[in-house]
Amino acid sequence: MRRSDEIDTPRGPARADVDLPHSEPATLLVLGHGAGGDVDAPDLVALRNAALGAGIGVARVTQPYRVAGRRAPAPAGHLDEAWTAVVGELMRRHRSIPTLVVGGRSSGARVACRTAGALSASGVVALAFPLRPPRAPERSRAAELETGLPTLVVNGDRDPFGVPSAGPRIRVEVRPGERHDLRRDPVGIAEVVVDWLRERGWTA
């Protein structure tokens, strides 16, 4: 079942594209897009398809600034506020789904990391996590990955934003030849994520 809805947030309407498998899922995976991108990025679409095939519900969230037609991203606090409102509403609508996993690509991965604890998520999926700006390598964002939750990071070894280090609760999968867009093998990347979700017991 597929449904697309606008959801009101304190920062304007967002959009949630929700896909549910035929049987009741045990997990809802909520994904956010990159700063200048959208939820139809190849890695997000491939992950949606693979997760659905594994019996996981998937919601891809478009931030209010993109719904309004702007490409320049909103401030981090605004992104977090809108995302939190959308995920909260999705969990209210799908309260029968017991497990929430949040994630996204690039900026969306950062938002998911920053809000995962407050949303009572069980885990985080971070695709193309932008560890540091290419022109400001001293500005590391590694602390955002320290959510205290099981976290999977999938980055390319040619990503100009760098590759995070693994930690006690952070698994890092490095994809050879991939850059920040993760376009070379999105299906393979999706399989890595679903395998990790399966290991955690979050698939059907």
Located regions from the model:
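Gly/Ala-rich beta-loop-alpha elbow adjacent to hydrolase catalytic centers
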Residues: 104-112
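A conserved short beta-strand
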Residues: 120-133
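Serine-hydrolase catalytic machinery in alpha/beta-hydrolase-like enzymes
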Residues: 5-98
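Hydrolases whose catalytic domains are alpha/beta-hydrolase-1, hotdog thioesterase
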Residues: 111-115, 135
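Short beta-strand/loop motif that positions the catalytic acidic residue
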Residues: 147-148, 153-155
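Catalytic histidine-centered segment of alpha/beta-hydrolase-like enzymes
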Residues: 178-190
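Conserved alpha/beta-hydrolase "acid-adjacent" motif
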Residues: 156, 160-165
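Short beta-strand immediately N-terminal to the catalytic nucleophile in serine-hydrolase-like folds
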Residues: 99-104, 127
